[in-house]
Amino acid sequence: PGLMNIGFLGTGRITSSVIEGIFKSKLKIKKIYISPRNRLIAKKLKKRFKRITISKDNQQLIDKSNWVFLAVTPKVGDKILKKLNFKKNQKIVSFISTMNLAQLKKAIGKKVKIVRAIPLPPISIRKGPIPICPPDKQVKSFFNKLGTTVEIKNEKSSINFWATSGMMAPFYEILKVLADWLVKKGIKRSE
């Protein structure tokens, strides 16, 4: 993808991890719009990264972005997507685990390109697999700069990836805690 604006609907841990990965990568992004919902995380991200703008609301984020990343819980997604006005032909990348493509299309109600993705916390250090469904050349290129894209052709198969990814976040959290503990005990992080 060329120089574009992207927006993150939802400002939690996965959004933070993806944004960290973006700034460590060679991705050329003009501006990143983030939703104001979690003010604390939004302000921390804006302080760290100059190209971030905290949107006044979710609609402004959608209006300003070429790509919109849906990084909200399934409950929130179901509630807010119907109220938002997406642009025709906008690219939507959904991290919402339990909303399939048909449900997302129905909630969005516009002709947009939707790709589901499963980023995990190591994306912040540009590591790990990122399953996407359905395959999409631009989304694959984007995520290949943040890890290793795994294209899933069949959405039914993607359910297995969603299930296992739910177990990976706590696993990586435990590894991080253990690594931090070793550093406190005098071992260099590079070891």
Residue ranges with predicted function:
Residues I29-K31, N89, S190:
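Short acidic capping loops at alpha-helix termini that bridge into adjacent secondary structure
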Residues S55, A117, I152:
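Hydrophobic residues at beta-strand termini and immediately following loops
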Residues F8, G12, S16, R39, ...:
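Electropositive phosphate-/nucleotide-binding environments in soluble metabolic enzymes
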Residues Q103-K113, G128-W162, G166-E191:
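Internal alpha-helical scaffold of NAD(P)-dependent oxidoreductase catalytic cores
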Residues R13, S17, G21-I22, K44, ...:
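Alpha-helical scaffold segments in soluble metabolic enzymes
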Residues G10-T15, K24, N100-L101, I125, ...:
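Short, flexible micro-motifs
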Residues R39, F49, N58-I132, D136:
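Rossmann-like NAD(P)(H) cofactor-binding subdomain of soluble oxidoreductases
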Residues G2-K56, Q60, K64, K145:
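NAD(P)+-binding Rossmann beta1-loop-alpha1 motif at the extreme N-terminus of oxidoreductases
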